[in-house]
Amino acid sequence: MGQKIHPTGFRLAVSRNWASRWYANNRDFAGMLAEDIKVREYLKAKLKNAAVSRILIERPAKNARITIYSARPGVVIGKKGEDIENLKKELASRLGVPVAVNIEEVRKPEIDAKLIADSITQQLEKRIMFRRAMKRAMQNAMRLGAQGIKIMSSGRLNGIEIARTEWYREGRVPLHTLRADIDYGTSEAFTTYGVIGLKVWVYKGDTLGRNDLPAVETPRPEEERRPRGPRRDGRPGGDRAGAGRGPRRPMGGNAAPADGSDKPAGAGGTDATAVKRVRKVDAPATAADGKGE
């Protein structure tokens, strides 16, 4: 199950949040969703060289707020903010409402799944060996704090006639664990031999809730230990008998008595008289009852 399903959709409302956050009734929902898809396609094509990781779209009260997560915010903003102003006007004309655009910088693009996939596809389009590009990306991700990474490429690798799939993994990638923070990204490389698809899974650790906070384990309180008394052999030991317990039963209380009786020792009390049982044995008879003499 966890190996096949989309990692982000599998964790929605558990440890992941939606990329489009707004509410609409049944009449307007389809149209607004189509607008979101067109806006994402437009931004993907326009900001192709800006290393865009993800796009968040919000629609509060007849407005729109779009947050762009990019590893190169300077490319999105442009000189003196000219590009960002033109981008706001274009998005406002497409959505029909005032649009506010926020730019968030991605601090570590080496452990972002989408940016890793885009970087590998750019190298494949420049005729770089796919194994070298994949292993280099894995080494950079593990060096900068990723706990696990898996990269899969499929298509006519190295220009061979028969398409195949190859994947490499380093560390651990628990796809079925809901609390695991799995970043997933895809990309496509358009080469002269055909299209090569890239899939990247990055495991960044465990999270609590949808705030992407690191999981903090609360230490268990140490058990209270009672002071230990001296042991029988003189070494310092522990008094294993609990406080308030009665005297222990003597060893061998249920053992068979030495006199051969079938009652446990001490069952009749100290004043009881011990009765010894004697087994009666018949005397052997003579050969002719004494008449043979």
Swiss-Prot record:
Signal peptide: none
InterPro entries xref list: KH_dom, KH_dom-like_a/b, KH_dom_type_2, KH_sf_prok-type, Ribosomal_S3_C_sf, Ribosomal_uS3_bac-typ, Ribosomal_uS3_C, Ribosomal_uS3_CS
Disulfide bonds: none
Keywords (A to Z) from UniProt: Ribonucleoprotein, Ribosomal protein, RNA-binding, rRNA-binding
UniProt xrefs under Gene3D superfamilies: 3.30.300.20, Ribosomal protein S3, C-terminal domain (3.30.1140.32)
Family matches, as SUPFAM superfamilies: Prokaryotic type KH domain (KH-domain type II), Ribosomal protein S3 C-terminal domain
GO CC annotation: cytosolic small ribosomal subunit
One Pfam family per UniProt: KH_2
GO molecular-function terms, A-Z: mRNA binding; rRNA binding; structural constituent of ribosome
Biological processes per GO annotation: translation
Listed Basic and acidic residues bias regions: 219-238
Transmembrane spans: none
The KH type-2 domain, residue ranges: 39-107
CDD domains xrefs: KH-II_30S_S3
Disordered: region residues: 210-293
Family: Belongs to the universal ribosomal protein uS3 family.
Subunit structure: Part of the 30S ribosomal subunit. Forms a tight complex with proteins S10 and S14.
Function: Binds the lower part of the 30S subunit head. Binds mRNA in the 70S ribosome, positioning it for translation.
Protein's UniProt name: Small ribosomal subunit protein uS3
Organism annotation: Paracidovorax citrulli (strain AAC00-1) (Acidovorax citrulli)
Protein's gene: rpsC
